[in-house]
Amino acid sequence: MYHQLILMALIGVIMANVVPFSMSNIPEEYKEFIPEEVKNFYKNLSIFLCQILRELASKHATFTNEDAALEALKNKSDKLYQKAVELRNFVKAKIDSLKPDAKAFVDEIIAKVRSLRPEDGQKLDMEKLKQAARDIIAKYEALNEETKEELKATFPNTTKIITNEKFKRIANSFLQKN
Protein backbone atom coordinates (compact mmCIF):
# COMPACT_ATOMS: atom_id res chain seq x y z
CA MET A 1 0.00 0.00 0.00
CA TYR A 2 2.73 2.46 0.86
CA HIS A 3 4.14 2.29 -2.64
CA GLN A 4 1.19 4.40 -3.76
CA LEU A 5 2.59 7.32 -1.83
CA ILE A 6 6.10 6.81 -3.05
CA LEU A 7 4.81 7.11 -6.56
CA MET A 8 2.74 10.21 -5.89
CA ALA A 9 5.71 11.91 -4.28
CA LEU A 10 8.12 10.87 -6.99
CA ILE A 11 5.79 11.90 -9.79
CA GLY A 12 5.30 15.27 -8.15
CA VAL A 13 9.01 15.86 -7.74
CA ILE A 14 9.77 14.67 -11.22
CA MET A 15 7.07 16.85 -12.75
CA ALA A 16 8.23 19.79 -10.66
CA ASN A 17 11.84 19.43 -11.75
CA VAL A 18 12.02 17.73 -15.12
CA VAL A 19 9.21 18.15 -17.57
CA PRO A 20 9.50 15.30 -20.10
CA PHE A 21 9.09 17.55 -23.07
CA SER A 22 8.32 14.64 -25.33
CA MET A 23 6.45 11.41 -24.79
CA SER A 24 9.15 9.79 -26.90
CA ASN A 25 11.59 10.33 -24.00
CA ILE A 26 9.59 7.95 -21.83
CA PRO A 27 10.49 4.24 -22.09
CA GLU A 28 7.77 2.15 -23.75
CA GLU A 29 7.26 -0.07 -20.70
CA TYR A 30 6.21 2.99 -18.65
CA LYS A 31 3.95 4.71 -21.17
CA GLU A 32 1.01 2.49 -20.24
CA PHE A 33 1.03 4.02 -16.75
CA ILE A 34 0.68 7.59 -17.97
CA PRO A 35 -2.86 8.97 -17.72
CA GLU A 36 -4.51 9.81 -21.05
CA GLU A 37 -4.87 13.43 -19.95
CA VAL A 38 -1.11 13.75 -19.58
CA LYS A 39 -0.54 12.02 -22.92
CA ASN A 40 -2.99 14.44 -24.52
CA PHE A 41 -1.12 17.40 -23.03
CA TYR A 42 2.13 16.35 -24.70
CA LYS A 43 0.55 15.09 -27.90
CA ASN A 44 1.60 17.12 -30.94
CA LEU A 45 3.73 19.63 -29.05
CA SER A 46 6.06 21.35 -31.47
CA ILE A 47 9.73 21.97 -30.79
CA PHE A 48 8.83 25.63 -30.22
CA LEU A 49 6.25 24.76 -27.54
CA CYS A 50 8.72 22.40 -25.87
CA GLN A 51 11.24 25.24 -25.76
CA ILE A 52 8.66 27.43 -24.04
CA LEU A 53 8.10 24.73 -21.42
CA ARG A 54 11.84 24.40 -20.84
CA GLU A 55 12.28 28.15 -20.53
CA LEU A 56 9.47 28.55 -18.01
CA ALA A 57 10.56 25.47 -16.06
CA SER A 58 14.02 26.99 -15.70
CA LYS A 59 12.41 30.10 -14.16
CA HIS A 60 10.18 28.24 -11.68
CA ALA A 61 11.57 30.13 -8.68
CA THR A 62 10.37 33.45 -10.10
CA PHE A 63 6.71 32.44 -10.00
CA THR A 64 4.88 33.11 -6.74
CA ASN A 65 2.24 30.47 -7.46
CA GLU A 66 0.67 28.33 -10.18
CA ASP A 67 -1.44 31.19 -11.47
CA ALA A 68 1.65 33.32 -12.05
CA ALA A 69 3.28 30.46 -13.94
CA LEU A 70 0.14 29.97 -16.02
CA GLU A 71 0.02 33.69 -16.79
CA ALA A 72 3.62 33.56 -18.01
CA LEU A 73 2.70 30.55 -20.12
CA LYS A 74 -0.29 32.41 -21.55
CA ASN A 75 1.98 35.31 -22.53
CA LYS A 76 4.20 32.87 -24.46
CA SER A 77 1.59 30.62 -26.07
CA ASP A 78 -2.17 30.65 -25.82
CA LYS A 79 -2.35 27.09 -27.18
CA LEU A 80 0.04 25.77 -24.54
CA TYR A 81 -1.77 27.76 -21.86
CA GLN A 82 -5.10 26.20 -22.85
CA LYS A 83 -3.61 22.70 -22.71
CA ALA A 84 -2.05 23.39 -19.30
CA VAL A 85 -5.29 24.78 -17.89
CA GLU A 86 -7.18 21.73 -19.15
CA LEU A 87 -4.73 19.38 -17.43
CA ARG A 88 -4.70 21.46 -14.25
CA ASN A 89 -8.51 21.49 -14.13
CA PHE A 90 -8.60 17.72 -14.57
CA VAL A 91 -6.24 17.15 -11.64
CA LYS A 92 -7.96 19.80 -9.52
CA ALA A 93 -11.37 18.20 -10.14
CA LYS A 94 -10.04 14.83 -9.00
CA ILE A 95 -8.61 16.35 -5.83
CA ASP A 96 -11.73 18.42 -5.17
CA SER A 97 -13.89 15.29 -5.49
CA LEU A 98 -12.19 13.73 -2.48
CA LYS A 99 -13.69 13.66 0.99
CA PRO A 100 -11.99 15.94 3.55
CA ASP A 101 -9.51 13.38 4.98
CA ALA A 102 -8.32 12.21 1.56
CA LYS A 103 -8.21 15.77 0.20
CA ALA A 104 -6.18 16.98 3.19
CA PHE A 105 -3.77 14.11 2.69
CA VAL A 106 -3.29 14.86 -1.03
CA ASP A 107 -2.92 18.59 -0.34
CA GLU A 108 -0.25 17.77 2.25
CA ILE A 109 1.62 15.60 -0.25
CA ILE A 110 1.53 18.37 -2.84
CA ALA A 111 2.84 20.91 -0.32
CA LYS A 112 5.62 18.57 0.82
CA VAL A 113 6.69 17.78 -2.73
CA ARG A 114 6.72 21.46 -3.67
CA SER A 115 8.92 22.18 -0.66
CA LEU A 116 11.49 19.76 -2.08
CA ARG A 117 11.93 21.76 -5.24
CA PRO A 118 15.51 23.02 -5.35
CA GLU A 119 16.43 26.66 -5.70
CA ASP A 120 17.67 27.80 -9.10
CA GLY A 121 21.06 26.29 -9.82
CA GLN A 122 20.76 23.71 -7.05
CA LYS A 123 20.29 19.97 -7.42
CA LEU A 124 17.48 17.98 -5.89
CA ASP A 125 18.51 16.70 -2.45
CA MET A 126 17.91 12.96 -2.74
CA GLU A 127 18.14 12.36 1.01
CA LYS A 128 15.43 14.97 1.63
CA LEU A 129 13.34 13.32 -1.08
CA LYS A 130 13.77 9.90 0.53
CA GLN A 131 12.87 11.26 3.96
CA ALA A 132 9.82 13.02 2.53
CA ALA A 133 8.72 9.74 0.91
CA ARG A 134 9.16 7.93 4.24
CA ASP A 135 7.11 10.63 6.00
CA ILE A 136 4.37 10.38 3.40
CA ILE A 137 4.31 6.60 3.71
CA ALA A 138 3.92 6.87 7.48
CA LYS A 139 1.04 9.32 7.09
CA TYR A 140 -0.60 7.12 4.48
CA GLU A 141 -0.35 4.07 6.71
CA ALA A 142 -2.10 6.05 9.46
CA LEU A 143 -5.11 6.75 7.21
CA ASN A 144 -8.27 4.72 7.73
CA GLU A 145 -9.15 2.05 5.15
CA GLU A 146 -12.04 4.07 3.70
CA THR A 147 -9.70 6.97 2.88
CA LYS A 148 -7.13 4.61 1.36
CA GLU A 149 -9.82 3.02 -0.84
CA GLU A 150 -11.06 6.45 -1.93
CA LEU A 151 -7.54 7.42 -2.97
CA LYS A 152 -7.21 4.19 -4.97
CA ALA A 153 -10.56 4.75 -6.68
CA THR A 154 -9.81 8.39 -7.52
CA PHE A 155 -6.28 7.74 -8.78
CA PRO A 156 -6.53 4.36 -10.57
CA ASN A 157 -3.40 4.88 -12.66
CA THR A 158 -1.40 5.33 -9.49
CA THR A 159 -2.80 2.03 -8.26
CA LYS A 160 -1.85 0.39 -11.56
CA ILE A 161 1.71 1.61 -11.18
CA ILE A 162 2.17 0.68 -7.55
CA THR A 163 0.96 -2.87 -8.13
CA ASN A 164 3.59 -3.33 -10.85
CA GLU A 165 6.31 -5.65 -9.51
CA LYS A 166 9.12 -3.87 -11.34
CA PHE A 167 8.05 -0.55 -9.86
CA LYS A 168 7.89 -2.07 -6.37
CA ARG A 169 11.49 -3.28 -6.63
CA ILE A 170 12.68 0.14 -7.82
CA ALA A 171 10.79 1.96 -5.06
CA ASN A 172 12.07 -0.33 -2.32
CA SER A 173 15.68 0.04 -3.41
CA PHE A 174 15.27 3.81 -3.75
CA LEU A 175 14.11 4.20 -0.17
CA GLN A 176 16.93 2.18 1.36
CA LYS A 177 18.89 4.30 3.82
CA ASN A 178 22.50 4.86 2.79
Swiss-Prot record:
Coiled-coil annotated spans: 67-89, 122-154
One Gene Ontology CC term in the entry: extracellular region
Primary location class: secreted
Subcellular location: Secreted
Signal peptide residues on this chain, from the entry's feature table: 1-16
Matching Gene3D superfamilies: 1.20.120.1100
GO molecular function: fatty acid binding; retinal binding; retinol binding
Keywords assigned by UniProt, alphabetized: Coiled coil, Lipid-binding, Retinol-binding, Secreted, Signal, Vitamin A
PTM description: Not glycosylated.
Purpose: Binds retinol and different fatty acids.
Assigned protein family: Belongs to the fatty-acid and retinol-binding protein (FARBP) family.
The name this protein goes by in its record: Fatty-acid and retinol-binding protein 1
